[in-house]
A protein has these predicted regions:
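Intrinsically disordered, low-complexity regulatory segments
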Residues: 1-140, 225-226, 333
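Conserved phosphate/pyrophosphate-binding and hydrolysis machinery centered on Walker-type P-loop NTPases
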Residues: 6, 56, 60, 79-84, ...
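Solvent-exposed alpha-helical segments within well-ordered globular domains of core cellular machineries
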Residues: 14, 18, 61-71, 91-95, ...
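Long, highly charged, low-complexity internal segments
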Residues: 25, 34-55, 167-286, 290, ...
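C-terminal or mid-to-C-terminal helical accessory/interaction module adjacent to the motor/catalytic core
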Residues: 71-72, 116-200, 247-254
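Short glycine-centered, acidic/aromatic-flanked micro-motifs in structured strand/loop junctions
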Residues: 80-82, 268-270, 298
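Conserved ATP-binding/catalytic motifs of P-loop helicase motor domains
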Residues: 106, 175, 294
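Extended, highly charged linker/hinge segments and catalytic-adjacent loops that couple domains
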Residues: 132-135, 148, 291-335
């Protein structure tokens, strides 16, 4: 008799089943198993925002497989992703199984892990919890708002602007921000200005470049050389002078390493260094996560597990020596 574990993807299911052994059956939900009915009235504001859930054929099929596996099990572990959507999927799976009567006499618990490693998975199974109701309610509020905004505004948009796309809780606001920014760009008027730089050599023969900042006893402002004629006049005046280094200042600059990636910084860095779009970045990160190479990537937190920090410090010390490691781990706070 094996316990049943439900995750989101089949690739993750295979890995976790390997870690847990033959006493566990690990099945995938393949993402969300149901959603709101695609019709007017799926969310009822006058009835305490009651929500009508439609049936998804694939979701029904997967829940049926889970129900069959539960016939010989005592426990059901809901191990979907450790975020709001993951909590929602677990809630939907539990609710649909309860409707089928598949949970009678079964102990249902929620487990989460931020990395797919044997240690993390086994620790999660040993420390289960109940479903996080506030997180589920946050999902329900988000889903209801998405529906109400989309189904209310989209028909108006289509009537006023035939051929336009749908409206949305997030996309409509984002579109306004883009339009406002575009209006600012169109209102911008380019203005010409010139700067002058000179090439010098130190007594030791080292070359360096310096910018002209003062002319005829006055500091040059950004638009004081508005055209080529003014720049050439300033250049001629500058060439007639003699120059010496008045002082040299040396400063030690300390630069702290960046905190661990969260979703937004991961996407920005992948775009800057690798030229990857947001979707490609998240697909790649998802594959790395499911293979156990990185921690969960959909997060706005920057804290790391103590065990992970200790392992990293041991690796740095053995590979590069103690001089490359601070005396104590750096602490980063999530905003």
């Amino acid at each position: 008799m094996s316990d049943v574990v439900v995750v989101e993807s089949p690739a993750k299911a295979k890995t976790i089943e390997k870690y847990l052994g033959r006493d566990f059956t690990v099945l995938a939900s393949y993402g969300h198993v149901r959603d709101l009915e695609e019709k007017d009235g799926a969310v009822l504001p006058d009835q305490d925002f009651a929500m009508l859930w439609g049936k998804d054929p694939r979701g029904e099929q997967q829940v049926g497989k889970i129900a069959s596996a539960l016939k010989g099990a005592k426990r059901l572990y809901l191990a979907t992703d450790p975020d709001r959507e993951g909590e929602a999927i677990s809630w939907h799976v539990k609710d649909m199984l309860a409707e089928r009567g598949a949970l009678k006499g079964k102990h249902v618990q929620r487990i989460t892990f931020n990395e797919i490693t044997k240690r993390a998975v086994q620790y999660a199974v040993a420390h289960p919890r109940d479903l996080d109701q506030p997180l589920i309610e946050a999902y329900l509020a988000r889903r209801a708002l998405d529906y109400l905004v989309g189904y209310t505004l989209s028909p108006v948009l289509w009537r006023k602007l035939p051929g336009s796309r749908s409206a949305g809780r997030v996309q409509s606001v984002a579109l306004r921000l883009i339009c406002e920014r575009e209006a600012e760009i169109e209102a911008f008027r380019a203005r010409e200005y010139w700067t002058i730089e000179g090439r010098f050599t130190t007594a030791a023969g080292a070359p360096f470049t310096a910018r002209l900042t003062h002319l005829e006893g006055r500091k040059l402002e950004q638009f004081d050389l508005p055209d080529e004629a003014a720049a050439m006049r300033a250049k001629k005046l500058a060439e007639g002078g003699s120059y010496s280094v008045a002082s040299v200042e040396k400063r030690r600059v300390r630069r702290n390493p960046p905190p661990p990636f969260m979703t937004s910084t991961l996407q920005m860095e992948a775009s800057r260094k690798l030229g990857m779009g947001a979707q490609q970045t998240m697909r790649t990160a998802q594959a790395l996560y499911e293979a156990g190479h990185i921690t969960y990537m959909r997060t706005d937190g920057v804290t790391m597990a103590r065990e992970a920090i200790a392992a990293i410090r041991d690796h740095v010390k053995s590979e590069f020596g103690p001089n490359y490691m601070p005396a104590a781990p750096r602490e980063y706070a999530s905003k």
